[in-house]
């Protein structure tokens, strides 16, 4: 039975059911040991919620690569998985509980973790459904979760080994503290915003003197923990006060006045209060001079006992109350309004508090040095684009120790125990044998600690004999955004080199962020976020995937433009209709076969040569990850060369009496269309499968079909030049018909003026195509032209000529054009007058002014066209 495609392209119908069919057939399952391996691990999405448009972009690029490699004959593994995302996921669950009036402390650790597991299962199912809707060819038999038993073993192994090497240690330092989540944050979990604030200048009275020191601060609430006052030893204004004391106006404490060259002579009054427990620079000074380091805040950002009557207040409430009291007491010298950079928690968005705390840290310098050295070897990771390697190396060269402990309950517990009697610390892969005498550290590890092991922990490490590890590690390509080069890419690199001795991936493709049409970052606050599932419902996954890949260059941001989705849908509809045309013309026993090149006509040879050029270009750009070039090449070939030209030209043979020419055209149509859908498959998996199944094909599914290869027999160095004559003549006839309003139903005669002796045979060969497409007949070469001759320059400086006197009344047509020019001159004069009149431009509604501007532009455009037309007629 002859296969057909429905009259209308319906993306919902086309995409329905295919993904499950592919899964049932296990097309995505890796493990064919006869093939060369190629592996990608998915950047595991957080189980915090649904996937967003950025995830769709990132995973579509990976799917395009993996489908391409699978079709090229690789044993292509795309390993899926998800991240437990400790702090972020716990924050989501706590927010849900708060809506029910429940806090995590009401539930306790065990029950809260149970609730988070429920959340994880709920959103893991949602994420898998979204992956399916996007058409991602993931090998689910190898799916991993960062909290899986095997991955948790790897986390403990890494922690213990680093600890035993002295690269993990406990220390009391100033860290970034999130008072909402009540946990430490690493530096890169803090984002900075420029916000308006104040610089407060307060009077400190010198003990035993009437003199006053004016000291500036942006955080008056920390004054209760001040331990000293510092000036510069070379500052003549304050030398006499060194060794004396000044009274802290917040609590009456007498603070020693000390000198240190660290003090910035140009900042404020060049007198600095020292608050060791609430400022990293003050902390260093306090260590240098052995000062006490008390804290005046609790972990939730409220004031503690040191704050006296302000105890229990939120830190910012305390600031306002203290300021009010200072103003009443005459402590305030003056206040400046400033704009300064303030750190915020990436998760809770709370203002981060520099806070003295005992935490676990990774000593980063040796690990970073190893990663940088590895980049100088053959085992280097290649960054695409290259400029991001500089981003990586700059960060690694200036890296600080990594705070890895988090005061939350969802995450990998730190494998450290404290003896209940002696306080002795034990770190190990397993709990102590007499575990009842020990208490495990309450903290969990930073989510990125386990994520950093993802490329090798998912492959069975620390068992380096695991078949997965031996076959698929290092992985080939990582695809990720530039926003997590520090968070994730860098950490995977140094951990992989430390624990496997090899790079985690051979290359990393870096992309940007998706922004809205105005270039703004998508966010909940702006309400400009886009759910990719909604886009798929409206336009289809193939349209979304094409848009994402055809509008992205490595390393660059992308703008989401809804109108482009509609254009993409129209493009797929064009492909659909071209397939229907082919199917309508072939018999049910039509085969996909190699073509007999000697029997092919000019159009057949041209489209096959162009197809070779496209395959070469697509291969080159796929290998360079230049997906926008892939899309551009395919679009031009399909829309222009195949649909607009070749299909139209094929009608000459399909409707003619020459059976051999008809068979040649049909075979070429089938061959080219089959190749097109295979080239499209990595980008448009659903519609390519639908068309592939309808037309003659070789494999059970396009998923496992062979990637198109160049056929050298179809290369033709001269065919494009020859075909250009045909295109130019057809375009020339169409242009003359349009300019002089000659209906397509009227057959026109044309001549060609040329100085090329060898052109006549070619022009005779293409004449039937010209006749078929534009109803025009060639009546001679290098013949005299009439005074009413219209010309169009074609390839090689030759000219196409049509005697207009045969088809139109030239004088009447000229008169019409001259009349139109006069009318347009009047409209232009009127429009220019209105728009130069301030009474109109300042008083009329803006919309009306813009409308007049648009009209004037239109009149000018029409005027220029009419003048050009008259010039040609003359």
Regions found by a protein language model. Give the residues of each.
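N-terminal, positively charged nucleic-acid-binding surface of large information/translation enzymes
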Residues: 1-234, 258, 275-288, 292-307, ...
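Active-site-adjacent bridging/hinge elements
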Residues: 34-42, 64, 100-102, 128-135, ...
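Secondary-structure transition/capping motifs at alpha-helix termini
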Residues: 67-75, 96-109, 129, 133-138, ...
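Short, polar/flexible loop-turn hinges at active-site or ligand-entry regions and domain interfaces
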Residues: 100-114, 381-382, 533, 554-566
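Short Cys/His-rich metal-coordination motifs, predominantly Zn2+-binding knuckles/fingers
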Residues: 181, 251, 348, 419-422, ...
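Short acidic-hydrophobic surface loop/beta-edge motif
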Residues: 200-207, 244-249, 343-347, 417, ...
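Feature 926 captures the class I aminoacyl-tRNA synthetase adenylation module centered on the KMSKS loop
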Residues: 201, 394-449, 453, 498-541, ...
